Structure formats: C-alpha cells, structure tokens
Amino acid sequence: MKICRKIILLVLTISVLFVFSCKTNEKKNSAAQANGDLSKYELVAEAATKQCPVMLDEITRLDSVQYKGKENALIYNYSIINVKKSDLPANATDLAAGMMRDTMLSKLKGQAALDMFRKDKVKLVYVFKDMEGKDLFVFDFKHTEY
C-alpha cells in the first residue's frame, strides 16, 4: 500500500512539475540573434540551470536543463528525492510511466508558451532519476506530438 501511495504521489507530482519546467522560453538578446536561432535554446538552458536546483514540490527537484544542438532537444533533468528505483515494483513503474507520459503530453498540448519550440521543431526530453541517480523515467516528445 505504501508503494502504491508513493507511485500515486509521484504521478501527481510529475503532472504539476512539468507545468513549471516549460516556462523557460525567453526573448532572444542581440548576441543570440547574431548567433542564430539555435543559440537561443542554449541561452534558455543556461538561464534555467542557473536557477537550479529548484524544489518543485516536496519530492521533486529540477536539477538542470540542457540543450543538445545536434538533436535539437531541450533536456530537463529531475530528481525524485525520496524514491529508490529498487523499491518500486517493475509493473507499477511501467503503469506509472504510461500514466505520467499521457498526462504530461496532454498538458504540453495546451501550452501556448511552447509555440516557439514547436515552430523550431525542438524535441522536449524529461529525465527523472531516483534518489541514487538511477533513471526512473525518460519521456521525449517530438514537436509534432506536443
């Protein structure tokens, strides 16, 4: 029962936290304009990472944001600070991952703030690690999905 409660809390937390993670679209400055469109995403990632680590709720921390130019991807790195992957049953993890992905995708679709990302075909990647640094979930969304 305790594990199910943690999973439900994790799903709800993820749903709330990613609303905050997508608020990183900033205006280009003159240096970014001189370097082209791709550097604006490097600036977005740097600006977001400077504010990290940020506790989004009692168990979720945004650790960093990266931009991978070759993949044209913004990667949001999170830690779930009181969950160990080894404590979660595999079937519960798979179920939670499916629910979280669906919830995240539906919330991404409703965000006008992501129009610039869609236009520039940026892939959004959300990486969640447990308290030991092991991958719990990785969600990636192509611009055509969100």
Residue ranges and their predicted role:
Residues 1-9:
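Bacterial N-terminal signal peptides that target proteins for export
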Residues 18-21:
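C-terminal motif of bacterial Sec signal peptides marking the signal peptidase cleavage site
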Residues 23-26:
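Bacterial signal peptide processing site
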Residues 31-51:
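Post-signal peptide N-terminal segment of mature Sec-exported envelope proteins
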Residues 56-82:
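Short edge beta-strands and adjacent turn/loop segments
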Residues 86-114:
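Short, non-transmembrane amphipathic alpha-helical segments
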Residues 104-136:
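A short amphipathic beta-strand at an alpha->beta junction
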Residues 133-146:
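Short, low-complexity, Pro/Ser/Thr/Gly-rich segments in the mature regions of secreted, periplasmic
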